[in-house]
Every structure is written in C-alpha cells, then in structure tokens.
C-alpha cells in the first residue's frame, strides 16, 4: 500500500512539479517559488539546489526510466558544467544569478560535496564519462584545499582563503566544523565510489566514517553532536533529530557500498541505537520533531526531516526486524500525506508546518535549500527497498 502511494506521489506530483521549473531561456531551473506559489524568474539560482535537482532527475531515471527524466538531468548537468564550476580556482560557486553568472563565489565543502554527489549520479545514469571526470575535479579540490589535522575545513572565499562558516552555523552559534558537512561528504564519496570504485575515494570515505563514529557520535546518549570549533570541541548543546535519522541510513549505505564487513557490523549497531533513540524521544503525534536546543524542543514539522524519518525507520527495520520501526515509518508517511503535502494547484510540499498543522507561510516552496532531493529520494528509497506496509 505505502509503496504504491509513494510511487504515485513521485510520478504524479513531485516530478511534474519540478518539470515546470525548467528554465530553457537561461539554463538550469528557476530558483525561487514563494509560499503563495509566485514564481520569480529572476531570482538567484542556488548551486546546492541545482546539484540536488541533477541528483534527483538522475536517480529518478535510474528508478523509473523515461527519456524526459534523463533529458532534465542533462539540462541540470549542462548548467552545472557550464556555469557553476569554477574552472580557474576549483570547486563550485555558492550562488548564480538568474542568467547563470556567479552571484556568490564562496567555496563551501558542503556545497562542493553535493556537486560530487550529483555528478557521480549523472554518470551512473547517463554513462557520460565527462560527468565522471567532472566529479573528480571537486573531489580533488576538497582533498587539496580543505584538509587539516582535524579533517576538513568548510568555508572559504573563491581563492580558498578561510572565511566564517555562516552558511552552516545556526541557532546563534558560530561553528567552524559541522556534523552536517561530514555527513554529506560521506554521502558524496559513497556515490563517487559506487560510480568508479576508486580506492583513494574509499580511503577518504573510511576516514570520515571514523570521524562520525569516534568523535561525532556520543555513546552515552546515542546521539550525534552538531557543531564544533576547529579542534573538534563541542559548540552549543543541540540535538538535530532529522540529521540523526538521516545519518543512520546514509552511514549504513556507505558501509554497504564499501563492502567492508567490519564497518558494516560496527555501524549497523551504532545506527540502530541512534534510530531507537530518535524513535523514543523525537517521534510525537505521528511526526518527527525538529530539534532540541538546550532544554527547548522545536516541534516544527520540517519537510526534509519527515522524509528522512521514513527512510531511516525503514532502514532500521531492515537491520533489526523490529516492526515498531515499520509502524513509525507508516505514521510519518500518513502525517506527510495529511499535512506536509501541499494540495493546492501548483504546490509541492510545504517547507514547514507547526505542531498543530499550520503551514509557515513565510517559508518558500522552492529556494536555495528547498529542493526535490529529500522528498524525491524518500520516494525512490521506498520503491527500491521494497518494504511495504
């Protein structure tokens, strides 16, 4: 039942919505659609948004087939190849204007990771060896320009001089290093290794998994730390429920792709503990709360947190056989259907909904961070995992 509903959501709602945002005049996809569904054709175009769109169409094609999906993937690929990559200094830009010229030339490890993720997927979908070569450019740029004794630095100007990490700092905190960046480097390197089997990529992927296991994970609480200074000292007291449940299945996936049996066992045990913890403390009224900051719980229902919860709970069920995880996945999907999916003509999913089910009308429908990657990926993961309820 759930698989058929989610397949329909992908094919009849999410994909058609994003198809309409293709910009054939200036390349790429339009960068902003308001809560009121007003399209701004001259809005800046986020590079993270475009990497995620490229990943989405590439994987939708590999999951469903269909020439239109591959064509839209190619359209996103051409925009990234021709506009977003900095061929002079390396990496990718942070933001383009509506015509495809650089609007913000900051280099960020998180953003560059998504370019690797997307280009690797497009290579797998299309077989275009140029895309694989382009995926290795940002990989080498990260390895050359961001490494230091504690792993990977995150925020730089165009010429790789360090700048404040404002892009990934939140809650009034300044964080030099983030769990978020490490997680999405793991995600990106997993996809690149899956595409090409390069042992250097495998080695760096194992290094990052080790950082998550040995530094970011807290065994006493079965939670992941969020923000750090340059020496990996904790900054703030935040628990991000969505990132925890997303990390469980992404780390399991990385170990599966690496084929390392010891790592598989270590992370399966750790990730199940994290999943149980999230189920116990964050699942409320059929949906996942957002985060804890010190003693305050933010109960906002954020679109991506709900999508990752469905995948994470299904993954936990597959590793444990515990049907309570399936029940949790089902409850979150039912909540998504009822309250997160935007049923207005021309809508997709609301960005955020309050605990009592009121959409936040100040949060855009499409923007630099509001994309088809989390909800689209949820659909594809449910389809390909084949676990029905």
Curated annotation (Swiss-Prot):
Transmembrane residue ranges: none
GO terms for cellular component: cytoplasm
Record key words, sorted: Cytoplasm, Isomerase
GO biological process: carbohydrate metabolic process
Protein name: Cellobiose 2-epimerase
Temperature and thermostability: Optimum temperature is 30 degrees Celsius.
Mutagenesis / variant outcome for changing residue 114 to A: Strong decrease in activity
Phenotypic consequence of residue 304 to F: Lack of activity
Reaction(s) catalysed (UniProt annotation): D-cellobiose = beta-D-glucosyl-(1->4)-D-mannopyranose
Protein encoded by which gene: ce-ne1
Cell location: Cytoplasm
């Amino acid at each position: 039942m759930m698989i058929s509903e989610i397949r329909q959501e992908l094919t009849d709602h999410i994909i058609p919505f994003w198809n309409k945002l293709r910009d054939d005049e200036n390349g790429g996809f339009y960068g902003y659609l308001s809560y009121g569904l007003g399209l701004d054709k001259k809005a800046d175009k986020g590079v993270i948004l475009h990497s995620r769109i490229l990943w989405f169409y590439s994987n939708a094609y590999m999951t469903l087939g269909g020439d239109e999906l591959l064509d839209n993937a190619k359209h996103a690929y051409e925009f990234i190849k021709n506009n977003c990559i900095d061929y002079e200094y390396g990496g990718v830009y942070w933001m383009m204007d509506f015509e495809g010229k650089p609007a913000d030339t900051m280099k960020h490890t998180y953003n560059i990771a998504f370019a690797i993720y997307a280009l690797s997927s497009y290579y797998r979908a299309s077989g275009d060896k140029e895309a694989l070569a382009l995926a290795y450019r940002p990989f080498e740029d990260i390895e050359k320009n961001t490494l230091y004794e504690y792993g990977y630095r995150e925020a730089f100007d165009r010429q790789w001089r360090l700048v404040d990490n404002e892009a990934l700092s939140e809650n009034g905190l300044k964080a030099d290093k983030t769990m978020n960046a490490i997680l999405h480097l793991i995600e990106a390197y997993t996809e690149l290794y899956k595409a090409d089997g390069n042992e250097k990529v495998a080695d760096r992927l194992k290094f990052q998994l080790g950082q998550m296991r040995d530094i970011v994970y807290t065994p006493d609480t079965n939670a992941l730390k969020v923000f750090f200074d340059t020496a990996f000292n904790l900054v703030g007291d935040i628990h991000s429920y969505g990132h925890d449940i997303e990390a469980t299945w992404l780390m399991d996936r990385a170990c599966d792709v690496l084929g390392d049996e010891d790592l598989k066992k270590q992370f399966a045990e750790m990730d199940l503990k994290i999943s149980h913890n999230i189920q116990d403390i964050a699942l409320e009224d059929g949906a996942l709360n957002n985060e804890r900051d010190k003693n305050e719980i933010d109960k906002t229902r954020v679109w991506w947190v709900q999508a990752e919860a469905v995948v994470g709970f299904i993954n936990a069920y597959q590793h444990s056989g515990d049907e309570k995880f399936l029940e949790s996945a089902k409850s979150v999907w039912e909540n998504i259907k009822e309250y997160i999916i935007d049923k207005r003509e021309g809508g997709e999913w609301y960005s955020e909904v309050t605990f009592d089910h009121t959409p936040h009308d100040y949060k855009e429908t499409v923007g630099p961070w509001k994309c088809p990657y989390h909800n689209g990926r949820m659909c594809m993961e449910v389809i390909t995992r084949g676990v029905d309820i």
